[in-house]
């Protein structure tokens, strides 16, 4: 683990599964017609800097589906690119407070932000709104899940968000997710 960054294995911490959830587990959950979106989540913290300004930030590694699954809005720019979850693009989306503290009155979109030992191009700014997975959205930096795996030197996900195609499908999707993970984790 990089000494400047900390990632967690909250799947074990939360007591939900005896084995870490991985991106491969999350990808397996996309294989049901009843599932509309899947967003793997890796969490950690790291020092972020732009110019002479530095601060500790909460980092979420995820996919393009995170925007819709969490019902987030953008204040500027775009969100994570769609595509191969295993490709760690060096792009990020930042919360409004991060934008304000690190970039001041200047534009953030298009600038390079250093997170730990990595440089990420800012492609979007999240609109100010509430909390998500216990963290103020204004204080988040969101990067592709593969980039988070490299940044935190870990493959353990915090959790996987799964969105059913309809409210009626939720019980079947829940059972399908449990069965799929049980099969992938040899009954655990």
Task: Indicate where each model-derived feature is located.
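Hydrophobic, regular-secondary-structure patches
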Residues: 1-58, 65-68, 82-83, 100-101, ...
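Proteins with a high burden of low-complexity, intrinsically disordered sequence enriched in S/T/G/P/A and R
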Residues: 1-9, 61, 77, 183-188
């Amino acid at each position: 683990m990089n000494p400047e960054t900390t990632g967690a294995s909250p799947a074990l911490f939360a007591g939900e599964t005896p084995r870490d959830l991985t991106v491969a587990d999350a990808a397996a959950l996309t294989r049901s017609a009843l599932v509309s979106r899947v967003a793997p989540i890796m969490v950690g913290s790291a020092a972020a800097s732009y110019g002479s300004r530095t601060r500790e930030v909460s980092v979420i590694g995820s996919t393009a589906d995170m925007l819709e699954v969490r019902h987030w809005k953008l204040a500027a720019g775009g969100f994570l690119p769609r595509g191969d979850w295993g490709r760690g693009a060096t792009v990020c989306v930042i919360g409004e407070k991060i934008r304000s503290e690190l970039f001041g009155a200047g534009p953030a979109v298009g600038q390079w932000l250093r997170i730990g030992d990595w440089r990420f191009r800012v492609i979007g700014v999240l609109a100010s709104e509430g909390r998500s997975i216990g963290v103020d959205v204004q204080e988040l930096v969101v990067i592709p899940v593969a980039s988070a795996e490299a940044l935190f030197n870990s493959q353990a996900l915090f959790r996987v968000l799964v969105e059913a195609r309809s409210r009626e499908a939720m019980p079947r999707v829940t059972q399908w997710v449990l069965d799929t993970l049980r099969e992938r984790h040899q009954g655990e």
